[in-house]
UniProtKB/Swiss-Prot annotation:
InterPro entries: NAD(P)-bd_dom_sf, SDR_fam
Pfam family of the protein (one): adh_short_C2
Documented EC number(s): 1.1.1.-
Record protein name field: Short-chain dehydrogenase reductase 5
Entry keyword annotation includes Signal: no
Active site: 157
Protein backbone atom coordinates (compact mmCIF):
# COMPACT_ATOMS: atom_id res chain seq x y z
CA UNK A 1 0.00 0.00 0.00
CA UNK A 2 2.82 2.34 -0.88
CA UNK A 3 3.80 4.26 -3.98
CA UNK A 4 1.51 5.70 -6.61
CA UNK A 5 -1.85 4.12 -5.87
CA UNK A 6 -3.61 5.89 -8.76
CA UNK A 7 -0.74 6.04 -11.24
CA UNK A 8 -2.07 6.88 -14.70
CA UNK A 9 -5.70 7.01 -13.55
CA UNK A 10 -8.13 9.70 -14.71
CA UNK A 11 -10.48 10.92 -11.99
CA UNK A 12 -13.52 13.19 -11.79
CA UNK A 13 -14.13 14.73 -8.36
CA UNK A 14 -17.43 16.53 -7.89
CA UNK A 15 -17.51 19.16 -5.18
CA UNK A 16 -13.75 19.38 -5.69
CA UNK A 17 -13.37 23.11 -5.10
CA UNK A 18 -13.32 22.89 -1.31
CA UNK A 19 -13.46 20.63 1.73
CA UNK A 20 -13.21 16.88 1.23
CA UNK A 21 -13.18 17.23 -2.55
CA UNK A 22 -10.24 19.62 -2.60
CA UNK A 23 -8.28 17.41 -0.19
CA UNK A 24 -9.04 14.41 -2.42
CA UNK A 25 -7.87 16.29 -5.51
CA UNK A 26 -4.51 17.01 -3.87
CA UNK A 27 -4.15 13.50 -2.49
CA UNK A 28 -5.18 11.70 -5.68
CA UNK A 29 -2.75 13.72 -7.81
CA UNK A 30 0.00 13.01 -5.27
CA UNK A 31 -0.72 9.36 -6.05
CA UNK A 32 -0.29 9.77 -9.79
CA UNK A 33 -3.82 10.60 -10.97
CA UNK A 34 -4.92 13.34 -13.30
CA UNK A 35 -8.00 15.00 -11.84
CA UNK A 36 -10.89 17.00 -13.23
CA UNK A 37 -12.38 19.15 -10.48
CA UNK A 38 -16.11 19.61 -11.04
CA UNK A 39 -17.91 22.32 -9.08
CA UNK A 40 -20.10 25.41 -9.34
CA UNK A 41 -17.56 27.47 -7.36
CA UNK A 42 -15.50 28.60 -10.34
CA UNK A 43 -12.92 30.80 -8.63
CA UNK A 44 -12.27 28.31 -5.83
CA UNK A 45 -12.12 25.40 -8.26
CA UNK A 46 -9.67 27.16 -10.57
CA UNK A 47 -7.51 28.08 -7.59
CA UNK A 48 -7.37 24.47 -6.40
CA UNK A 49 -6.40 23.30 -9.89
CA UNK A 50 -3.68 25.95 -10.17
CA UNK A 51 -2.33 25.14 -6.70
CA UNK A 52 -2.01 21.47 -7.69
CA UNK A 53 -0.60 22.21 -11.14
CA UNK A 54 -2.49 22.44 -14.41
CA UNK A 55 -0.52 19.49 -15.76
CA UNK A 56 -2.26 17.33 -13.15
CA UNK A 57 -5.57 19.06 -12.44
CA UNK A 58 -8.16 20.99 -14.39
CA UNK A 59 -11.45 22.63 -13.47
CA UNK A 60 -14.85 22.17 -15.12
CA UNK A 61 -17.81 24.27 -14.03
CA UNK A 62 -20.94 22.16 -13.72
CA UNK A 63 -24.37 22.32 -12.12
CA UNK A 64 -24.84 18.68 -11.17
CA UNK A 65 -28.62 19.07 -11.07
CA UNK A 66 -28.55 19.56 -14.86
CA UNK A 67 -28.02 16.21 -16.59
CA UNK A 68 -26.78 17.82 -19.80
CA UNK A 69 -24.04 19.60 -17.87
CA UNK A 70 -23.13 16.34 -16.13
CA UNK A 71 -22.89 14.51 -19.46
CA UNK A 72 -20.74 17.32 -20.84
CA UNK A 73 -18.41 17.15 -17.83
CA UNK A 74 -17.80 13.46 -18.51
CA UNK A 75 -17.31 14.16 -22.23
CA UNK A 76 -14.83 16.93 -21.41
CA UNK A 77 -12.83 14.54 -19.25
CA UNK A 78 -12.72 11.78 -21.85
CA UNK A 79 -11.87 14.19 -24.67
CA UNK A 80 -9.07 15.72 -22.60
CA UNK A 81 -7.59 12.52 -21.16
CA UNK A 82 -8.89 9.71 -23.37
CA UNK A 83 -10.70 7.79 -20.63
CA UNK A 84 -12.27 7.89 -17.17
CA UNK A 85 -11.16 5.48 -14.45
CA UNK A 86 -12.61 6.88 -11.23
CA UNK A 87 -15.59 8.98 -10.21
CA UNK A 88 -15.53 10.49 -6.72
CA UNK A 89 -19.09 11.81 -6.40
CA UNK A 90 -18.62 14.12 -3.46
CA UNK A 91 -20.75 17.22 -4.13
CA UNK A 92 -23.45 17.88 -1.58
CA UNK A 93 -25.53 20.47 0.22
CA UNK A 94 -27.02 20.54 3.71
CA UNK A 95 -29.87 22.66 5.03
CA UNK A 96 -29.90 24.09 8.58
CA UNK A 97 -31.21 21.98 11.44
CA UNK A 98 -34.90 22.40 12.15
CA UNK A 99 -38.02 20.62 13.29
CA UNK A 100 -39.73 18.15 10.96
CA UNK A 101 -42.88 20.12 11.84
CA UNK A 102 -41.43 23.09 9.96
CA UNK A 103 -39.80 21.18 7.08
CA UNK A 104 -39.12 23.46 4.11
CA UNK A 105 -40.09 21.31 1.13
CA UNK A 106 -38.41 23.60 -1.39
CA UNK A 107 -35.16 23.16 0.52
CA UNK A 108 -35.89 19.43 0.70
CA UNK A 109 -36.24 19.26 -3.09
CA UNK A 110 -32.99 21.20 -3.57
CA UNK A 111 -31.12 18.88 -1.21
CA UNK A 112 -32.42 15.78 -2.98
CA UNK A 113 -31.65 17.28 -6.39
CA UNK A 114 -27.99 17.81 -5.52
CA UNK A 115 -27.26 14.94 -3.16
CA UNK A 116 -29.21 12.18 -4.94
CA UNK A 117 -30.20 13.20 -8.46
CA UNK A 118 -26.83 14.81 -9.15
CA UNK A 119 -24.99 11.74 -7.91
CA UNK A 120 -27.26 9.50 -9.99
CA UNK A 121 -26.57 11.52 -13.12
CA UNK A 122 -22.82 11.32 -12.61
CA UNK A 123 -22.94 7.60 -11.85
CA UNK A 124 -24.99 7.07 -15.02
CA UNK A 125 -22.71 8.99 -17.37
CA UNK A 126 -19.42 7.98 -15.75
CA UNK A 127 -20.47 4.33 -15.90
CA UNK A 128 -21.51 4.67 -19.54
CA UNK A 129 -18.04 5.95 -20.36
CA UNK A 130 -16.36 3.15 -18.41
CA UNK A 131 -18.50 0.48 -20.07
CA UNK A 132 -17.87 1.91 -23.54
CA UNK A 133 -14.10 1.80 -23.03
CA UNK A 134 -14.04 -1.51 -21.17
CA UNK A 135 -12.65 0.19 -18.07
CA UNK A 136 -12.94 -1.68 -14.79
CA UNK A 137 -13.52 1.54 -12.93
CA UNK A 138 -14.30 2.65 -9.41
CA UNK A 139 -17.14 4.91 -8.32
CA UNK A 140 -17.02 6.35 -4.80
CA UNK A 141 -19.82 8.46 -3.30
CA UNK A 142 -19.59 10.59 -0.18
CA UNK A 143 -22.48 9.41 1.96
CA UNK A 144 -22.54 10.19 5.69
CA UNK A 145 -22.98 8.72 9.13
CA UNK A 146 -26.54 9.96 8.63
CA UNK A 147 -26.97 7.33 5.90
CA UNK A 148 -26.86 4.70 8.65
CA UNK A 149 -28.76 6.34 11.51
CA UNK A 150 -31.24 9.14 12.07
CA UNK A 151 -30.64 12.00 14.46
CA UNK A 152 -27.25 13.63 13.87
CA UNK A 153 -28.16 15.52 10.70
CA UNK A 154 -30.95 17.74 9.36
CA UNK A 155 -34.01 15.91 8.02
CA UNK A 156 -33.57 16.57 4.29
CA UNK A 157 -29.85 15.82 4.44
CA UNK A 158 -30.45 12.58 6.34
CA UNK A 159 -33.11 11.47 3.86
CA UNK A 160 -30.83 12.28 0.92
CA UNK A 161 -27.92 10.30 2.33
CA UNK A 162 -30.11 7.28 3.03
CA UNK A 163 -31.25 7.49 -0.59
CA UNK A 164 -27.68 7.87 -1.83
CA UNK A 165 -26.58 4.76 0.03
CA UNK A 166 -29.45 2.87 -1.59
CA UNK A 167 -28.25 4.14 -4.96
CA UNK A 168 -24.69 2.98 -4.21
CA UNK A 169 -25.90 -0.51 -3.38
CA UNK A 170 -28.22 -0.68 -6.38
CA UNK A 171 -25.54 0.59 -8.78
CA UNK A 172 -23.12 -1.97 -7.35
CA UNK A 173 -25.52 -4.71 -8.41
CA UNK A 174 -26.03 -3.25 -11.86
CA UNK A 175 -22.41 -2.48 -12.70
CA UNK A 176 -20.61 -5.48 -11.25
CA UNK A 177 -20.93 -7.42 -14.51
CA UNK A 178 -18.82 -4.73 -16.17
CA UNK A 179 -16.13 -4.93 -13.51
CA UNK A 180 -17.09 -1.53 -12.09
CA UNK A 181 -17.05 -1.15 -8.31
CA UNK A 182 -19.37 1.24 -6.45
CA UNK A 183 -18.86 2.17 -2.80
CA UNK A 184 -19.69 4.87 -0.30
CA UNK A 185 -17.46 6.67 2.16
CA UNK A 186 -19.37 7.80 5.23
CA UNK A 187 -17.82 10.47 7.45
CA UNK A 188 -18.92 11.72 10.84
CA UNK A 189 -19.01 15.51 11.24
CA UNK A 190 -16.22 17.33 9.40
CA UNK A 191 -15.63 21.07 9.46
CA UNK A 192 -15.99 21.86 5.74
CA UNK A 193 -17.96 24.41 3.74
CA UNK A 194 -21.14 22.43 4.46
CA UNK A 195 -20.87 23.02 8.18
CA UNK A 196 -18.43 25.90 8.68
CA UNK A 197 -17.97 29.38 7.27
CA UNK A 198 -15.00 30.81 9.16
CA UNK A 199 -12.39 29.88 11.77
CA UNK A 200 -14.85 30.41 14.61
CA UNK A 201 -17.44 28.00 13.19
CA UNK A 202 -14.72 25.49 12.28
CA UNK A 203 -13.74 25.39 15.95
CA UNK A 204 -17.39 25.15 17.03
CA UNK A 205 -18.05 22.20 14.70
CA UNK A 206 -14.86 20.41 15.68
CA UNK A 207 -15.48 20.97 19.40
CA UNK A 208 -19.05 19.66 19.12
CA UNK A 209 -18.07 16.62 17.04
CA UNK A 210 -15.17 15.81 19.37
CA UNK A 211 -17.46 16.03 22.40
CA UNK A 212 -20.04 13.68 20.87
CA UNK A 213 -17.55 11.33 19.18
CA UNK A 214 -16.96 7.75 20.27
CA UNK A 215 -13.28 7.75 19.32
CA UNK A 216 -11.41 10.31 21.41
CA UNK A 217 -8.05 11.95 20.82
CA UNK A 218 -8.52 12.50 17.07
CA UNK A 219 -10.32 15.37 15.36
CA UNK A 220 -11.83 14.22 12.07
CA UNK A 221 -10.45 16.23 9.15
CA UNK A 222 -11.28 16.30 5.46
CA UNK A 223 -7.95 14.59 4.76
CA UNK A 224 -9.03 11.50 6.72
CA UNK A 225 -12.08 11.14 4.48
CA UNK A 226 -9.94 11.68 1.38
CA UNK A 227 -7.64 8.88 2.57
CA UNK A 228 -10.61 6.50 2.74
CA UNK A 229 -11.81 7.60 -0.70
CA UNK A 230 -8.31 6.96 -2.08
CA UNK A 231 -8.45 3.40 -0.75
CA UNK A 232 -11.81 2.78 -2.41
CA UNK A 233 -10.72 4.44 -5.66
CA UNK A 234 -7.54 2.40 -5.94
CA UNK A 235 -6.85 -1.25 -6.66
CA UNK A 236 -6.11 -1.75 -2.96
CA UNK A 237 -9.87 -2.35 -2.73
CA UNK A 238 -10.12 -4.35 -5.95
CA UNK A 239 -12.75 -6.80 -4.61
CA UNK A 240 -14.71 -4.36 -2.47
CA UNK A 241 -18.04 -3.15 -3.85
CA UNK A 242 -21.40 -2.14 -2.45
CA UNK A 243 -19.91 -1.10 0.88
CA UNK A 244 -20.31 2.05 2.94
CA UNK A 245 -16.93 2.67 4.57
CA UNK A 246 -17.48 4.49 7.84
CA UNK A 247 -14.99 7.22 8.72
CA UNK A 248 -16.77 7.93 11.96
CA UNK A 249 -14.63 6.50 14.75
CA UNK A 250 -17.23 3.83 15.45
CA UNK A 251 -20.08 6.32 15.92
CA UNK A 252 -22.64 4.56 13.73
CA UNK A 253 -21.87 1.11 15.15
CA UNK A 254 -22.03 2.15 18.79
CA UNK A 255 -25.08 4.38 18.38
CA UNK A 256 -26.95 1.65 16.53
CA UNK A 257 -26.09 -0.83 19.27
CA UNK A 258 -26.93 1.51 22.13
CA UNK A 259 -30.25 2.46 20.54
Amino acid sequence: MSGQRLDGKIVIITGGASGIGAEAARLFTDHGAKVVIVDLQEELGQNVAVSIGLDKASFYRCDITDETEVENAVKFTVEKHGKLDVLFSNAGVMEPHGSILDLDLEAFDRTMAVNVRGAAAFIKHAARSMVASGTRGSIVCTTSVTAEIGGPGPHSYTASKHALLGLVRSACGGLGKYGIRVNGVAPYGVATGLTSYNEETVKMVEDYCSATAILKGVVLKARHVADAALFLASDDSVYISGQNLGVDGGYSVVKLTSN
